[in-house]
C-alpha cells in the first residue's frame, strides 16, 4: 500500500475530502499542513454534533470575556482565567448539562473560545504553516 493520508467525511450537507499522496519528494511540513487542516475541520465540526445548547455556551463565554480591540494586559488575562475556572462558571455549565462528562466537554470548548478571544492560539493553523512554507521557499532562493 502506498503512503498517503486520506480524510473523507460525508454527513447530510457536510462533505469534505483531504488527501495527500506521500512519496520521496513529500516534505514533512506538507504532512503537518494537511494534518493541521484536518484538525481544524474536525474541531470546528464537533460542536455541531454535540447535544448541548452551544448558544448558551457562547453566552457564558460572553460573560467571561468579549473580544476587544487593543492589547490585553496580563492583569486582564489573569482575571479572565480566574473567571473561566471559577465555581460560578461551573454552575452556569450546569444549566446546559448536569452530566460530569458533559461539563468536561463544555469546559474544553469554553477554554478554547476564551483563549482564542484573548489571542492565545490553542492549535496550529494550516494557514500559518502555509505561510511558513512560502516564506521558507522564498528565503531559500
Swiss-Prot record:
InterPro entries: DUF2666. This is Uncharacterized protein MJ0596. It comes from Methanocaldococcus jannaschii (strain ATCC 43067 / DSM 2661 / JAL-1 / JCM 10045 / NBRC 100440). The lineage of its organism: Archaea, Methanobacteriati, Methanobacteriota, Methanomada group, Methanococci.
Amino acid at each position: 500500500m502506498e503512503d498517503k493520508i486520506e480524510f473523507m467525511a460525508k454527513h447530510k450537507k457536510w462533505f469534505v475530502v483531504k488527501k495527500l499522496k506521500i512519496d520521496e519528494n513529500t516534505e514533512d511540513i506538507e504532512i503537518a499542513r494537511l494534518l493541521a487542516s484536518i484538525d481544524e475541520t474536525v474541531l470546528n465540526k464537533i460542536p455541531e454534533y454535540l447535544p448541548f445548547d452551544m448558544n448558551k455556551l457562547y453566552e457564558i463565554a460572553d460573560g467571561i470575556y468579549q473580544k476587544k480591540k487593543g492589547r490585553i494586559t496580563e492583569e486582564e488575562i489573569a482575571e479572565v482565567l480566574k473567571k473561566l475556572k471559577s465555581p460560578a462558571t461551573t454552575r452556569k455549565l450546569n444549566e446546559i448539562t448536569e452530566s460530569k462528562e458533559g461539563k468536561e466537554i463544555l469546559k474544553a470548548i469554553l477554554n478554547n473560545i476564551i483563549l482564542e478571544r484573548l489571542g492565545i492560539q490553542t492549535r496550529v493553523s494550516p494557514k500559518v504553516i502555509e505561510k511558513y512554507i512560502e516564506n521558507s521557499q522564498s528565503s531559500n532562493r
